[in-house]
Amino acid sequence: DGQRVLAEAGRQDTGHFRAREAFNELRINLQYMNPDDPPRIITVTSTSPADGKSTVAANLAIALVRAGVPAVLVDADLRRPTVATTFGLPAGAGLSDVVVGRASFVDVLHESADPQGLVILPAGQLPPNPTELLTSARFKEAIEALAETHMVIVDAPPLLAVPDASVVATRLDGALLVLDAESTTRDELRHAVQALQRVHAPILGAVLNRVDSKDR
């Protein structure tokens, strides 16, 4: 479907030298995509829930921080959040609570110890109406406030499961589409791209995940 592949990541995604290099390559490609006005707020999404989008989002945020770029990882997958669990954060308030006015950033932002400097905004209390929350002006305002001082990586829902991801992408600088090298079909890719194009969401490119090292 003509999508530019910005990086290929193998099956082993944590601590592995080759994986670290892949996400560093992704960081560089994104930062130099438009040197005069690089994307500040990036939606990371996928066709299906198990394609590895949350792993890619987390590793991209980590790569940015390791390169000296202040970054915030935001869990906007309000139906199936994983960021808090991945980073060992306690259950509590997060993005949804900020958007509805129950909490402020000072209450919900967490700073990672490893890597030091990565800021994490978990999903928070799961709302009954995720789509309405993610299409609200307050969601956009919250993300833009974070982007004043940090690059923002938004872990969004999968495109073909719910409408949330394509809606989120319209409000941010662009979407990064994660594809599973082992399972994503051409039809799924086509439908995902069409979902983004229907709402005029900019597509930054694709990440091919779970690539067998023998195939590289």
PLM regions with names:
Residues D1-P70, A76-S96, R102, V106-D107, ...:
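Short boundary/hinge segments that flank catalytic cores
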Residues R171-L172, V199:
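Short, structured coil segments at secondary-structure junctions
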